[in-house]
From Swiss-Prot:
InterPro entries: Integrase-like_N, TACO1_YebC-like_2nd/3rd_dom, TACO1_YebC_N, Transcrip_reg_TACO1-like, Transcrip_reg_TACO1-like_dom3, YebC-like. This is Probable transcriptional regulatory protein glr2507. Its main location: cytoplasm. SUPFAM superfamilies: YebC-like (SSF75625). One of its GO terms (cellular component) is cytosol. The keyword rRNA-binding does not apply. HAMAP family: Transcrip_reg_TACO1. Signal peptide: none annotated. It comes from Gloeobacter violaceus (strain ATCC 29082 / PCC 7421). GO terms for biological process: regulation of DNA-templated transcription.
Amino acid sequence: MAGHSKWAQIKRQKAKNDVAKGAMFARLSREIIVATRLGGPDPAGNFRLRLAIEQAKAASLPGENIQRAIDKGSGAIEGDNFEEIRYEGYGPAGVAILIEAQTDNRNRTVADLRAVFSRNGGNLGETGCVGWMFQQRGVAVLEGPVREEELIEAALDGGALGYEIDPQGQGVEVTCEAADLEALTDALKGAGFRLAAAEVRWVPDNNIELADPDVARQVLTLLEKLESLDDVQRVSANHLVEDAVLESIYA
């Protein structure tokens, strides 16, 4: 999809995460706690935990913090009782938004989300109001450049549904069924590809293109403010912005 802002927005998100390192560390720790609680403390038999640890190490989360999060998740030491909750809503121009949260206080999380939506031209909706517009997919992000022929062979071996290459050759996203993510990452690593990230993500069936810079700015501001909330792990939306529009916003 050359000419669109997908990769530019990924790079902007990485830069924003670097600035908010403290918040990122907290999110990584929560994910390790929840992954341990759901699948046990042994990463060899808990793929989600293994991914969480790899992401934490890549972000330079100290080893003692990683172990402490595992201990909290396993009950070896006392910790907060986080639960995973999905929230749904609408942004400006009818953009559908899914929020994945990990919280120890539902009332606080809902109040924070509702405040951000209402202040930025959106509405927090009921469960199911936009979820039907998305599908859960496994996504493996590879460092570029890559040889496309080799990528296709490894991706097919791992059960991939498709792939998308950064127009500038700086990365590749390979998608699969959520349940096939472990097999896909194993196949890609086995073929010698460098894995930058892997996660299960909500992917929209269709996108709303935002050609008006003012509307696009309002939507992006809403998404950024949602992402900045302490309890929010990930935000997915069905918006699409041309590179030229994005550049005019962040120039």
